[in-house]
Amino acid sequence: MKSMDKLTTGVAYGTSAGNAGFWALQLLDKVTPSQWAAIGVLGSLVFGLLTYLTNLYFKIKEDRRKAARGE
């Protein structure tokens, strides 16, 4: 049998997850489909920019390594 400590921890985590899920659903109900479309477009632009900046960072790093090796 599990100790009481582990049981109460599981119940607390389950209650917390249920509460978070409830409030997430409440928030989702307040956003209209057109707002979701705008959120999707803006999110795509942000992730595209982050991808570009990450690629730029590693290209600069690669160029510096090549310059240090004399290539």
UniProtKB/Swiss-Prot annotation:
The lineage of its organism: Bacteria, Pseudomonadati, Pseudomonadota, Gammaproteobacteria, Enterobacterales. It comes from the Bacteria. GO terms for molecular function: pore-forming activity. Belongs to the lambda phage S protein family. It comes from Escherichia coli (strain K12). This is Prophage lysis protein S homolog EssQ. Signal peptide: none annotated. InterPro entries: Lysis_S. Pfam families: Phage_holin_2_1 (PF04971). GO terms for biological process: symbiont-mediated killing of host cell. Keywords: Cytolysis, Host cell lysis by virus, Viral release from host cell. The gene is essQ.
